[in-house]
Amino acid sequence: MPASCETALQQRCQQIVTSPVLTPEQKRHFLALEAENALPYPTLPEDARQALDEGVICDMFEGHAPFKPRYVLPDYARFLANGSQWLELEGAKDLDDALSLLTILYHHVPSVTSMPVYLGQLDALLQPYVRILTQDAIDIRIKRFWRYLDRTLPDAFMHANIGPADTPVTRAILRADAELKHVAPNLTFIYDAEITPDDLLLEVAKNICECSKPHISNGPVNDKIFTKGHYGIVSCYNSLPLAGGGSTLVRLNLKAVAERSTSVDDFFSRTLPHYCRQQIAIINSRCEFLYEKSHFFENSFLVQEGLIDPERFAPMFGMYGLAEAVNLLCENAGLTARYGKNETANELGYRISAQLADFVENTPVKYGWKQRALLHAQSGISSDIGTTPGARLPYGDEPDPITHLQTVAPHHAFYHAGISDILTLDETIKRNPQALVQLCLGAFKAGMREFTANVSGNDLVRVTGYMVRLSDLAKFRAEGSRTNTTWLGEEAARNTRILERQPRVVSHEQQMRFSQ
């Protein structure tokens, strides 16, 4: 067929299949996305469609026909105990059984990335099956398991949880992660002052100094929302119900909302409520397709065997660009205040978060856990230009670490589906990991629900939720990468100041379509 006769879809597919930097599996993934996006979009009200087309609202490139939930958090403990009739597996009897069963089920857990975004609360899951094994025997098995995950499920949105208790499996995972320094899986330690011993938290801090993992979550804060042990931290720090997950994620560009506002009062009384309503309309439309037309919840063995419950999936009401919105509103009001620099601007930011939280809490959705969406400070996507992720401070001129934490902490109470701020510290912190412990505890005391740190000089760094190796970015365009998130980090490096800013990295979640 002559090139002039090729459709846009054919041209995009041709770019994918001839890409020199994608593996066959990655090409298959992107080709499937192109096919899905060739289908009609779920029916939307006119105002919602306009907001989506103008970029005031973004659907995260999830696809035009949501035939699976964005994030799935199976009840892995139930699976290990009972096995699976569908997979013809008996329950686990020892640690080898448990690890083998998990590696099988992971390949049957769907997500927006086509790989599992949640691996379970691994230490709590595996410890009952350790029995008489020595610590050395546990370490060998966990290290082998960790290497298996990185090699067969190479997606850094894949996320494991550990803590708050101290177990031999907890220590084995920390040792394996520090030694191997893998991009995948990502890791969150759930901290609880009443359960977590001081020496374990110090070990976690040493790991952060070594490989920028794990992320630390304030367990008691999440316990109040989901109840203890009934949630998981997944992907880019999304807090979601266990045995359920996140059905969809749609995000509001607050900068674009501010650009359409004539004043601060107009922003709060007219434009913000208007676009919040349009976002709920998009969420409802996408969830209607998932629940009523895709047949996922009717046919999935995960539902039939009690590993997930359709009523425990929550749509995520995302936002980003708060910093730019605040600065624009201040400028239009004739103020010199800047977000992160002045109390007036910071208070305006807190007011925006509070109004978003109030709207989400008081607006029912057609399909969702407790009939509500969950508010999420979305961490950006790799193609974002000119916006700061979530409620973060603008890049490049962040204040000292303590002021930084005190400034962003008041936002954290509002975002039940997760919020993250990346604190990048000088390499000298490696000589005093106890200082990192104190920063974390101080952040939690100030009200933060999540604590995330990168250490300057480490090759393994965090591009918000997901990890990349800096050494992989330079060679990606020539050689490609077996890890699905390297290309996202490379695109972020081109579109943002990720490699030019102060020691800290920009946060970007998944972009769902291939771009060269």
State the predicted function of each range.
Residues 336-359:
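Short secondary-structure subsegments characteristic of cysteine-rich extracellular domains
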